[in-house]
């Protein structure tokens, strides 16, 4: 040990890292190869960060400007070394980067990784960005020696993955001139990763398109042999790129191990020139519903990585992975310039249009592939209906919805409009949390009796976009839980064609009595033409949000003093008929019955009785009376 390396700091991993390392060491993954792709990806990132910092500080490159990644195989000592000449790390960066997981989603990762076991393990590693720790899948000890470019100190990080790690200074003679060297002391069952054939195959399959050349040193002291030339895939002609090439590149840029559901590769020419390579993932990224809703498209200038925070796509396309490369921006572009640049505004518009158009074409040419994309990302795309006024019509046409149609398949609005009933002037919808509960909703009864299709909307964003999208193809959207149903002008199906019962005088009197009894608990009580089987239901008044949106806003504390619901009564229901003919002098019983009807409507609406104790007492009194008769 050198004199410099006499002071050794010992640190304990934070709890989440310790747990993660335990999972890695005990290897819940069947595919061990993933560790190499992760470490190469980290090395390539380090090289690109150096290229970026060297724009304003070219002295960082010294006399060695060319980026490279070198893999050294040491079969005799069962070691694999991954070395890059990138930006490198200082002491604090080593502790921060390798001792903690400084990102959200770790707990969710733990839960999923433990549940997954061998299933989908490789994909989870990339999804959660914990690639370095995958080294412990194959190594029982890991040494990291790093020297940050432009500094005169080097540092050694070491761990056996059992709960702690050490950090110490190291002689410059024992460190890279700049960059990072990772030495994996391989487990007995992982010694195959010192085989030239094995490592070269993995590199070509998984990392052949990283924008940094990769070489293999077959044994210590041997000459390096290049196995990947660092050519940027997106600069090639599409005719030169195979499907496997695209898949390998996607896995690198997206950090996922599935296959892309859709690839969009184009070059825009004219006033502004840029190349874009974008992928729609084959599965949901873990951070799809992260509150920050950040995109992951990377911005390159002349093949130099600049940032992945340029917001090159709207938030409702945040699941798209890939990059844009342009030569029309300066390499030292600032964050402010990125936000204000007319070029980037043009890129955002062009890229968004191309991605949406490509998804539309897929919907026409391969409905099965599109259905998978919609299943994974439809709830996110629909955010755009609410947020993107310019493309609202396009997004509505692209969207698919569950409906009351017999085939139970997601439907396009264009198909819905084509099959509207004679006399139907609106697109009807019902919002809620649960599809099964929506299908059992009493508010649907009158629509089913007339064969009117109703959209069943279960995504939280559905309750918002329907309030901002005025219509589709000239047909307004109308909630079946808000205002009057106005179904009288639409004929019922033959099997439900019996005339709707008129509200007789007794029912009219009972409605008035119910209105008086309930008072301010409801905004109104009225007979309904939307009910055919149930006795009662709740709907929202004509003005204000529908029932589901009102609940969401109240739960979030966004509204106070919301309008009370309307209690609708089915005049043809035998219970209503019996109550309507109940002697008026039996007022206490009738009041109990009316309040029980309101609680029944609340339960049918997915709520609970407002006062459970009073509900139970009323129920007992009504049961008691019934048993005496």
UniProtKB/Swiss-Prot annotation:
Q: Does the keyword Nucleotide-binding apply?
A: yes
The molecular function GO annotations come to: ATP binding; ATP hydrolysis activity; ATP-dependent protein folding chaperone; unfolded protein binding
Matches recorded under Pfam families:
HATPase_c_3 (PF13589), HSP90 (PF00183)
Q: Which domain of life is it from?
A: Bacteria
Q: Where does the record place it?
A: Cytoplasm
The Gene Ontology CC terms held by the record are:
cytoplasm
Q: InterPro entries, from UniProt?
A: HATPase_C_sf, HSP90_C, Hsp90_fam, Hsp90_N, Ribosomal_Su5_D2-typ_SF
**Which controlled-vocabulary keywords does the entry list?**
ATP-binding, Chaperone, Cytoplasm, Nucleotide-binding, Plasmid, Stress response
Segments for region (C): 552-629
- Major localization listed first in the record, in broad terms: cytoplasm
Residues of the region (A) are: 1-335
Q: Give the region (B) as residue ranges.
A: 336-551
Function, as annotated, reads:
Molecular chaperone. Has ATPase activity.
**To which protein family does this belong?**
Belongs to the heat shock protein 90 family.
Quaternary assembly: Homodimer.
Q: What is this protein called?
A: Chaperone protein HtpG
Native organism is: Rhizobium meliloti (strain 1021) (Ensifer meliloti)
